[in-house]
Structures are given as C-alpha cells and as structure tokens.
Swiss-Prot record:
Keyword annotations from UniProtKB, A to Z: Cell inner membrane, Cell membrane, Membrane
Protein name according to UniProt: Putative membrane protein insertion efficiency factor
Localization (cell): Cell inner membrane
Major location category of this protein: membrane
Length: 93
C-alpha cells in the first residue's frame, strides 16, 4: 500500500503539479509532506497526517515551515552553528 501511495504522489508531482503552479503556503510543500509522512510513519498514519495537512493548507492559512513530526527536519537547528541542541545530563550532587 505504501508503494502505491508513493507512486500516486510521484505521478501527481510529474503530471499535475507543473500545470497547477506553486500554491502551497507551507514548506515543505503538501506533496513533499505527504511523501515524508508516508515514508516515516507508514501508509495509514502518513495518509492521515497528509489529509490533516491538506485541511490546514488554504488561502487564509498563514503557512510557514511545518515539517513532518518525528523526522530529522522536525529537530530545531541552531542558526549560527547548524547543529541541533543537545541535552547534557549533569551528575547530581
């Protein structure tokens, strides 16, 4: 099922997306978000996450950066160093 969904997304990106133009207010785009969600969370949960994202993507949405939860893109990165913050555990006194 996962391969079928990913193939359908590929067909959409190749056949329809160029004619519709870039209308997504989010980064990554909704189709990239759907692909990442299906790859990282499976067909059922990834499809649900993609459907919820499509409901958030409308002309009145503010948009912005909205990565798939639980992926590396979801990890905050320090702007100056490019490294993700690391929690350090100190020994208790």
């Amino acid at each position: 099922m996962k391969r079928i969904l990913l193939a359908l997304l590929r067909v959409y990106k190749i056949a329809l997306s160029p004619y519709l133009g870039s209308q997504c207010r989010f980064l990554p785009t909704c189709s990239d978000y759907a692909r990442d969600a299906i790859v990282h969370h499976g067909a059922a949960r990834g499809s649900w996450m993609a459907a919820c994202r499509l409901c958030r993507c409308h002309p009145f949405a503010q948009g912005g950066y909205d990565p798939v939860p639980g992926t590396e893109a979801d990890t905050p990165v320090h702007a100056a160093t490019g490294h993700a913050p690391v929690a350090i555990r100190l020994p208790r006194p």
